Swiss-Prot record, chain A:
Name of this protein: ATP synthase epsilon chain
Keyword annotations from UniProtKB, A to Z: ATP synthesis, Cell inner membrane, Cell membrane, CF(1), Hydrogen ion transport, Ion transport, Membrane, Transport
Signal peptide: none
GO molecular function, one term: proton-transporting ATP synthase activity, rotational mechanism
Taxonomic lineage from the root: Bacteria, Pseudomonadati, Thermodesulfobacteriota, Desulfovibrionia, Desulfovibrionales
Amino acid sequence: MASKLLLEIVTPDRKVLSQEVDYVGAPGIEGEFGIMANHIPFLSALGVGNLYFKEGNRTHYIFVSGGFAEVGNNKVTILAEVAEKAVEIDIARAQKAQEKAKARLAKAQDRIESARAQAALQRALARLTCKDAAQKAGTTTH
Amino acid sequence: MASLKDVQNQIVSIKKTKQITKAMNMVASAKLRGAQDRIERFRPYADKFYEMLGDLAAGADSSVHPLLEVHEEIKTVGIVLTTSDRGLCGSFNANMINAALKKAAEKKAEGKTVKFYCVGKKGAAAVAKTEYEIVEAYKDDMTHFDFNLAASIGNKVIDAYLAEELDEVFLVFGEFVNVASQPPNTLQILPMSSEAAGEEAESGASSEYIYEPSVEGLLAELLPRFVKVQVYRGLLDTSCSEHAARMAAMDNASRACDDMTETLTLLYNKTRQAAITADLMDIVGGAEALKG
């Protein structure tokens, strides 16, 4: 029995990642879920948040937004509109985005505007936590 | 008859033009390669996306989703026209615009209102001269666009469709067949035909999946994205076609320059010879007169 599974992350612009991993944790739309080898076929929508995978004793973090996960045959495919490895995340930009989103949220007039601001804020926060988690795990260089 | 100096000036100016067209040809070919790369990079995503959608559509009884629903009365038609921002690419933009305007005229003849969403300066400029309304024009975006552009166009038309402001949406783009051929293509993106969504349903021998949330919930997430994927594909194709068309146009221009230089050089030599002959005649005539 295989004990590893292949993780593939693709976005419209590029293939972000394709490698063998031990464990994948993904932010499902109805809560986080974990995938290990020999999982049964599974299809889920992803929310905005951090995906992480373990390889050996190292944990890597990736920010994803607007995606889907398909699991089957010891292969996890993530289709995301945006996917950034922790190392690629621009902290300064995320912080700026966070402040901007907060300001927009504060003076949002209608429901749509405030929902948009909230989504932007959520993305900025997720990026920051992603970088943070990766720094703690010491895997920002990967 | 043109003087010697005139012809020489003309030759010099044509040679300079040729330098420019040649440079543009090379730039276009480099950009074409880049654009083709992007299509290649997009392919894994698109393939996987269709596969997933196929699996889902096979699992679900053609479940009713507002984007699949055909509106009862079709009053307003939206056309998303993709063109380039810059000219000098032969008849490429004209072809796109003509295809879009033909579609618009067709719909108008059926008594429907037509609204335009224009990507690229050229299309927006051409449509602005017609009677049709431009809801949104994206200018200067074709040179460096990413999925966000497709997403924002997608969201615009989806919102309008759900609000029943639009009842049909078409995408006009330059299909990149190969370097020599980029015919305009018109694709209906809304309402989605369930065949398009379930196109690959039969090939996908779908295994028993666990779906989270439900099949319907997943479809609700996937279908709007399908619109964006189609728009993105259209944009990528158009940008590829634009560069290919410019390459061909500039190649033609360079060749035309060569032809003209050749003709002019011939003329130059003839004129020069004529001038020399005339001079000689003068000298000989003068010498004869002195002898006499």
